[in-house]
């Protein structure tokens, strides 16, 4: 049976974007997978996880795009190794791991790809409720950039779907488990590629999710 609807899925290699992609597939979309290399610390590991997730989803069309200019802009600890990754818990302020306007850049490129590939939707795994407080992960931001994208594209009908935006990390892990998303193929650590540090914001949020879901995380952590 020919699949009549297609979606660009922005897949970082982390568990949130992985779940969003599985939800897209379960909603009947043919996936066009999109991944970005921006010279982040765990770039090679994230790319590896992206391909493993795509393999599990049987995704044929994959795009890995070099957006290294993000590292040239700098101003964040994910690309600038002279800046330390915070290890003192989730802050009320926007942390130095925030990459300025990253999702705005990613979604603009995803919109161009969606138009070229004839996709009616873009799936992205942003989480507002249980996160590090990045301003480009909010529902308000997504709705606003969706309007801008449709003003700037020919058909004006691309929908950005954020199925995780109001979920807690515990809910994300539970739902991923129920959908048989292989979370052991995903990576969250900001700092390391072999053994997750367990103490950066992203690791803390991931571990919090598994604890709330009463499940064990199968990826390796520093002992």
UniProtKB/Swiss-Prot annotation:
- Look up the domain of life of the source: Bacteria
Cofactor section: Zn(2+)
Family membership, please give it: Belongs to the QueC family.
- Binding-site positions, Zn(2+): 189, 197, 200, 203
What does the entry give for GO biological process? Answer: queuosine biosynthetic process
Q: What does this protein do?
A: Catalyzes the ATP-dependent conversion of 7-carboxy-7-deazaguanine (CDG) to 7-cyano-7-deazaguanine (preQ(0)).
Keyword presence, Iron = no
> Catalysed reaction(s)?
7-carboxy-7-deazaguanine + NH4(+) + ATP = 7-cyano-7-deazaguanine + ADP + phosphate + H2O + H(+)
Q: How is the cofactor bound?
A: Binds 1 zinc ion per subunit.
Coiled-coil blocks: none
Q: What is the enzyme's main class? A: ligase
State the species of origin: Campylobacter fetus subsp. fetus (strain 82-40)
User: What's the EC number here?
Assistant: 6.3.4.20
List the gene name.
queC
InterPro entries linked: QueC (IPR018317), Rossmann-like_a/b/a_fold (IPR014729)
The record's annotation in CDD domains points to: QueC-like
UniProt pathway: Purine metabolism; 7-cyano-7-deazaguanine biosynthesis
Specify the protein name: 7-cyano-7-deazaguanine synthase
- Record-annotated residues binding ATP? 11-21
Provide the GO MF annotations for this entry. Answer: ATP binding; ligase activity, forming carbon-nitrogen bonds; zinc ion binding
Q: Which UniProt keywords apply?
A: ATP-binding, Ligase, Metal-binding, Nucleotide-binding, Queuosine biosynthesis, Zinc
